[in-house]
Amino acid sequence: MKGEQIGVFYHKSRFERKEFGSFFLSETPEVMSKGWDADFRRMCVWTKLFDKQSNQAFYVFCTHFDHIGTKARIESARLIVSKIKTIAGNSPIILVGDLNSSPQDTEMYHLLADYLTDTAISAIKKTIPTAGTFNGYDMKISDFQANQKIDYIFIQKFKGLDYRVLNDRYNDLSYPSDHFPVMCVVSY
């Protein structure tokens, strides 16, 4: 497949993959396609993991919303909530991704936040040295605005313990990505 590739990484020593799949963020999600007013084909991948330590199964969904299409982001959020309900049912959920949109983009954000919990808000401990998660490779920390938070970790039936935005520079010269890594320690 040409274009975007998204993966879910996990430790095989702790987790066993039980199921996996993907769908496109479009009106025809089962077919490779570009949706609504999107500039690129975008997708969501998912996997069902079994935690060998806790004997619990849960689902991880990973996505990347379009950076141009406002309607595409709104409809992608609506589609993901629908797919999560269909695929995962009542199971614990983790949804991660670059949503290319701030929480102030209320319709897109609330479609997700009304069903899932944003760990940036709900986690017991938060280490957020910057307001945003997008750095453009060379932005100074002082340049960050709250509306530059475009990367998210949403959960359902988990408790967010420690949410962090990691803003380390490589050799103090540049960032390894145009986005800061976002992480959250969770528990059942």
Predicted regions and their residues:
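Structured beta-strand-rich core segments of catalytic domains in phosphoester-bond hydrolases
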Residues: 1-57, 165
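Alpha-helical elements of Rossmann-like donor-binding domains used by nucleotide-donor carbohydrate transfer enzymes
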Residues: 4, 46, 75-83, 107
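Conserved hydrophobic/aromatic beta-strand scaffold that supports enzyme active sites
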Residues: 6-8, 44-48, 62, 152-153, ...
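Short beta-strand segments enriched in hydrophobic/aromatic residues
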Residues: 51, 64-65, 186-188
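Hydrophobic, aromatic-enriched interface-forming segments
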Residues: 62-67, 71-76, 80
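Active-site metal-binding loops of divalent metal-dependent hydrolases
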Residues: 63-65, 98-99, 180
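Metal-dependent phosphoester-hydrolase catalytic domains
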Residues: 71, 75, 85-93, 101-188
